Amino acid sequence: MRSFNLNIAGYKIRIESSEGGPELVPAERFLRNICNESDHDVLIRVHAGKFTIPGNAEKVFNAPYIEEINGIQVKKSDRFWSIHKYQNDLFIKTLFPLSLKSKKAILKYSLNSSEWDLWIEGGGAEVDPLEYPLDGLILYYLTVIHGDIMIHASGINSAGNGYLFSGVSGKGKTTMAKLWDNSGARVIHDDRLIIRHTGSGGYVMHNTPVYRNDVPLQSPLSKIFLIEHGKKNELIPVNGSGCVSMVMANCIQHNWNTEIIAGLLGSVSIMCPVIPAFRLLFKPDKSVIDLILKNE
């Protein structure tokens, strides 16, 4: 196809192939986010071939390629993606480590513009313009622009109550999602969520397409649990600056720009007094669900 529109976490994304550009073939995980809406928050034009970042652009961030093997993070390469700044423009330069083709891409974007450009080199006649890691990077910078929060967390909805379970890798996000799923709750996602303010004082958590069979899901956010494995189940209320710092520690953030960091800090600081938060030490069985529901 030459163009398509997506709605992911309420962000309206239009992707168009430029004149002479490649055919656009989004991966299966995005198909259920395709929509017919004509307006958009951001337009991304896709070009084939090489693009050269201005020579005097400053590299402001570099991300190595890290794989998780048996719960341990292992650096596989120093080269993955990087961010470069030239005047008011930003550039993401990336490789595609999961691709069968040896290709690379550059995304030109601005936090003050709704029109971005993407050049894919070595992709052939057909490309997925949202191939990993571009999907997460595009969504992250949309959260920055809109003052939202992207966080490492699983989320569920039980009887209308939305619970978010946040923690770094290995703390039990997926385990918690499975426990609730087995208890009949709706799992919003087990790994990554976007939290958006509703404009009327509340918050909604959204999933994003990560797995092949993902469908768009959202839930009002009722409580936040900062999780870790324990010998017994224990709920400890957290608030104030302690709550803000614990939530911030699990947020996805690029720390190269003080304004971006300040914006995220502001968003989390506004949310924490509104949404009750707890440290949750838990045993990986149904008893933790009983504890949470008992304290509802």
Question: Residues of each region from the PLM?
Answer:
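Conserved glycine(s) of the Walker
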Residues: 171-173
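Hydrophobic positions on the alpha1 helix immediately C-terminal to the Walker A/P-loop
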Residues: 176
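A noncatalytic interaction/capping subdomain that flanks phosphate/NTP-handling catalytic cores
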Residues: 1-164, 168-169, 179-186, 193-296
